[in-house]
Amino acid sequence: MLKVTNVHKAFGKNEILKGVDLTVDKGDVVVILGPSGSGKTTLLRTIDFLETADQGELEFDDIKTSLSHAHKNTILNVRRKTGFVYQNYNLFANKTALENVMEGLVTARKVPKDLALEIAEHALKKVGLLDRKDFYPSQLSGGQQQRVGIA
């Protein structure tokens, strides 16, 4: 289970997140919808420690920590166990679909390259893109790029 409570984040005087609570049970897929500028991406970036919250708590598996001052090892543990799909796909333009999927496995999760290759090919097969593994993002449709991000 992932649970965040009382998350606050401001940029200057502009409060983006004001006491946000969110609970996601294991295995759930969640879509966060809202108008532009409502804080959707900021919330996800805060949960993944890409932004520092002004206040808030996170519980995930056996981890309990503050979103405003978490230890580096805690941050790495959370990132290794979570995945987010953003509206923009954040693929590396100079890497193939296969290389993009492998990148996170090798760098963030420290998976050996030979195993990462096997996992990445399996993931691309699951999203129907194994036949496009050697294509660069510019050669893929928007939907295909998003599926690479999911893989």
Name the predicted role of every residue range.
Residues 1-151:
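ABC family nucleotide-binding domain
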